[in-house]
Amino acid sequence: MFSLLNMYRKVLELPLSFLVKNNPIPHHPIEELKLDPTQPMVYVLPYTSQTDLVIFRKNCLSVGLPDPLEKNEIEGKSLPRFVFLDEGRRFFKSKGAKEETIQVFNQYLELHHQRSDLDVQIIPVSVLWGRSPGHEKQSGLPQLRLLSGLQKFIAAVWFGRDTFVRFSQAVSLRYMVNEHGSDQAISHKLARVAKIHFSKQRISATGPRLPNREAMFNKLLASPTILDAIQDEAKAKNISEEKATQEAKKILDEIAANVNYEGLRVADRFLRWLWNKLYQGIDVQNADRVRKLALDGHEIVYVPCHRSHIDYLLLSYVLYHQGLVPPHIAAGINLNFWPVGGMFRRGGAFFIRRTFKGNRLYSTIFREYLAELFHRGYSVEYFIEGGRSRTGRLLAPKTGMMSMTLQALLQGQTRPISVVPVYVGYEHVLEVDTYAKELRGAAKEKENAGLVLRVIKKLRNLGKGYVNFGEPITLSNYLNQHYPEWKENTQAEERAKWFNQAVDSISHQVMVNINKAAAVNAMNLTGTALLSSRQRALSREQLLEQLESYQQFLQNVPYSQDIVVPTESPEKMLEHILQLERVGIIVEKDNFGEIVRLERNSAVLMTYYRNNIQHLFVLPSLVASIVLHYEAIQKPLVLEAVSKIYPFLKSELFLSFSYEELQDRVNHIITEFERQEVIKCNANMLSINKPRVRMLQLWSSGVREILQRYYITVSILEKDPATPRASLEKDSQSVAQRLSVLHGINAPEFFDKAVFSAFIASLKQEGYFNEEGIANTEKLNEITEILNQVISTEVCLTIKGAIAKIEEE
């Protein structure tokens, strides 16, 4: 019998090797699930299926896991390395697990009595044939069931490329024995837990059934809230309710997604081709925390930063290949053009207008549609910045979608809602040339199919893409901690007292968590180093030395536990960047060696990639700048200076450190600079280390332009503390534009009005204005004293000269 079974498996191997692709989830289970290769493993499959076993074994061997067909040899006993939970034709038709499976569990538990160092790892595994959730009112059981031979053959042909093997978090038998004992009841408990786990796993991979679009529309149009809005629309426009209802249907049709599973499969193949054409791979980190949320039944809201139109596609592609359900995505109405609008809609996009202002019917329908998505259990994605960042920095959050998300929770959403911040990064952004033109004043080109094709056609070899899932925010937990009154059954007017504050606070925390999940790449680091040189050029040796300094700093003084730092050597990073197309980096040779420099037109483009990680280096840059300009300074004075500037940096760059953590952070920075010999530290005195002064100069450059902007605004206020806010913003912008021309500053955000507006708001929040809006010059002088020391005399004179000219006008 045993040999016949082996022969049968061998017969299955040949066709399945051609038809079914290896798709393990996660892709590196040993590392991502923290499995211990020195301890035995036992794989648990949901039901008896030799086909599934063959596919599962193939995936095991491809990722370096022990062969499931081999035995575990423990204390002279030879025990199976895999078990099937259920024998039935349908998923878990029988009430209990297979008796032989219980016996195997019992034997493993008994061995834990004999060996105190033994810790068998029980690993639930399931094979997913396709990921279609089906449609509402569709008959049939979930797809996690034993298929007949013919059904399996059809599934292998049709879903072979979309078959996934899902490895779950291991259960420690040692933990089970220590906590619950080792009698036979524990074996049955293990089996029950595994059954529940497999059911949850299937739902987390496919999501709820897809809606019947027409039935969903009818339900929404019959809701009291939308009916009231329709009646108000009819009265306001003096039209019949029937006509207003037709308008409501048009709005719903404009907004709503029309998800099609087969469309997703086709899109997956197209996207696989696209990534292979454009990029050298997609690096994904921390997907396990999202899989855990899905298994625990959370409603997941993905909130990524917005770098490119391709973000929409990238995140859905990544989630699909991480065994998660692609979300419904809030996309700008500008993307609803032929033919991609229909493709996006079938892939889960629902479209949103740029503004809801003055259109109550539209805003009501959109809000109710979003609430319905939450109610039905669909994951949702939206870009909290509202649009793509043209500068590479995070934009101030637009809170409308977050407000509607919180409203859905307050309306009685039963499942917990967790917001997952997502950092998306690229070594080359498709639209970066367009961004540079727009920042120089060119009109934004309207999206259309021709534009998309032109962009894709001319680009290839763009390096890597990065997706890092940040620390989730479970809304109910956040509200319990910060706004405990949220559970009280209050009227909308009373709720507004804390509701708006909560929306702003959560939105800000999302931005902070996105920055905490930054994925640093070779382009970010190389751009940062070259832009730190006034000539945008460094010798090859200087550049490699600076790259190594950045890399070691991020490894030894990590910004957060979620940050991703390149592991390649500086030489390999530079070699990689030079091989990419359209980066604008040139290598020249002279009698002394090689010089690496930026092309004249590439400096603005490179600031985009520097700005992606500017928040990681702004504090060490400030410390370096203070030491460089003072030449020798006591550590307490450095801490004092940093503490005065930090509130503005924290607000502008969404920094994560609290004021209580700031001193420790600065001390860690100083310790690392001393270790790298960038500075010298004698007792409490910090000073320049002359042999490494060039490195200190490069480190200090990261904050230079930010401090110059602060100095502009503060200097205007010192001249006239009563300057109206609108004039203050306008004059600050004018001075910055002049400074950028005279001193060759290429950073596109340097004279951005929004940046000055945010700084002025921070000044107000920190108490630098009185109730009448008059600046407190005594308090401003504290900042000026610091800025006067760390900004060059030449720049200070240019700023003061420009301000004097404004006063003359």
UniProtKB/Swiss-Prot annotation:
The gene is plsB. Belongs to the GPAT/DAPAT family. GO terms for molecular function: glycerol-3-phosphate O-acyltransferase activity. It is a peripheral membrane protein. It holds the Pfam family GPAT_C. Its EC number is 2.3.1.15. One of its GO terms (biological process) is fatty acid metabolic process. It is found in: Cell inner membrane. The keyword Magnesium does not apply. The HXXXXD motif is essential for acyltransferase activity and may constitute the binding site for the phosphate moiety of the glycerol-3-phosphate. Disulfide bonds: none annotated. A motif (HXXXXD motif) lies at residues 306-311. Keywords: Acyltransferase, Cell inner membrane, Cell membrane, Lipid biosynthesis, Lipid metabolism, Membrane, Phospholipid biosynthesis, Phospholipid metabolism, Transferase. It is an enzyme of class 2 (transferase). One of its GO terms (cellular component) is plasma membrane. It comes from Pasteurella multocida (strain Pm70). It catalyses: sn-glycerol 3-phosphate + an acyl-CoA = a 1-acyl-sn-glycero-3-phosphate + CoA. Pathway: Phospholipid metabolism; CDP-diacylglycerol biosynthesis; CDP-diacylglycerol from sn-glycerol 3-phosphate: step 1/3. It comes from the Bacteria. This is Glycerol-3-phosphate acyltransferase.
